[in-house]
Amino acid sequence: MQKLLQKITQGSLVKQIMVGLVAGIIVALVSPATASAVGLLGALFVGALKAVAPVLVLVLVMASIANHKHGQKTNIRPILFLYLLGTFAAALVAVVVSFMFPSNLALVAGNAEINPPGGIIEVLKGLLLSVVANPFQALISANYIGILAWAVGLGLALRHSSDTTKSLINDMSHAVTMVVRAVIRCAPLGIFGLVASTLAETGFGALWGYAQLLVVLIGCMLLVALVLNPLIVFWKIRRNPYPLVFACLRESGVTAFFTRSSAANIPVNMELCKKLNLNEDTYSVSIPLGATINMAGAAITITVLTLAAVHTLGIPVDVPTALLLSVVAAVCACGASGVAGGSLLLIPLACNMFGIPNDVAMQVVAVGFIIGVLQDSAETALNSSTDVLFTAAACQAEDQRLADEDPLKVR
């Protein structure tokens, strides 16, 4: 019994997740009622991840900054640049693919209760207000912009504290990390529950009517994940990027695909960064920051659905307007985490560029909700895995630079 438990707790998490995935599909096909019931396992897993993620971010960032040594480099600027570059490039890819394979929408009735933001200024205003949120409210509502602001502020203040205080913060950081590891070990059960309940309750029948749109959306995301991102990483590290790309997709992307939450996947990404032996001072800040602003998947969703509406309505689009749409989609995507409903509710902003009435834009949003089972999952997988990928690329590039300058220097 003890050997079995040891095998379960120390075995390959990826293999266990794949077993959970297959088991979930089988249960959903054999007994939909049972599959709906085991959905509780998925809900518990996602709930546990969402519960521990805000505390993890607060404590890790605070500990990292409080113990930061003067002159020690954190690489946040290069990572931030990669985040913004990746998001804009993803929107550009979506524009090109949408022109190559234009989609038509069978527009459905909009949801009257949906309230999208009124403009880009409103989105940016929401992000700025998130910075000055009450710290307890930020933790409760998982407002990661607010959590990061308070963690950075407290960390800077605690730099001047005694060694005992710094030691206490470090111990808290280790304690929270241990809790996170325990939660992540439950991933196979969580994935099993999520897959089984999703297939049993939703199914994929509703998706067939939007097959071409889904192919364009998922195709763009695969193109970004397997071609564009590797090119960016190669430019940064100057060696074969695919081992790193596949490691991030396998260990971060798979979990994010089923949890459908970048915030819930933060602990998974933190653990992967540790496994990749990255600088903790860097990833403890860049991963929660990425979960907030690194939104390549959201940029693709906004662009593809907007251009599908434009094509359906027969509105002509020139090259400068298409480029402007890429910029607008990238800016909107960076604000997607601050909007309830995420990328879908920012589609009316982009539609507004082409003079599309709000009621028609909301019908496009409704189409987005119909295909959300796959769209949201793929979008989150791309967003979250890219957080780790770009963090690792920046860290490895910096390590290589230091090694070239001083071959005897060991980080």
UniProtKB/Swiss-Prot annotation:
Pfam families reported in the protein's UniProt record: SDF
An annotated GO BP: serine transport
Alphabetic keyword roster: Amino-acid transport, Cell inner membrane, Cell membrane, Membrane, Symport, Transmembrane, Transmembrane helix, Transport
Single GO MF descriptor: neutral L-amino acid:sodium symporter activity
Recorded catalytic activity of this chain's protein: L-serine(in) + Na(+)(in) = L-serine(out) + Na(+)(out); L-threonine(in) + Na(+)(in) = L-threonine(out) + Na(+)(out)
Subcellular location: Cell inner membrane
GO (cellular component) term, any one: plasma membrane
Membrane topology: Multi-pass membrane protein
Annotated function: Involved in the import of serine and threonine into the cell, with the concomitant import of sodium (symport system).
PANTHER family in UniProt: PROTON/GLUTAMATE-ASPARTATE SYMPORTER, SERINE_THREONINE TRANSPORTER SSTT
Protein name: Serine/threonine transporter SstT
Top-level taxonomy: Bacteria, Pseudomonadati, Pseudomonadota, Gammaproteobacteria, Enterobacterales
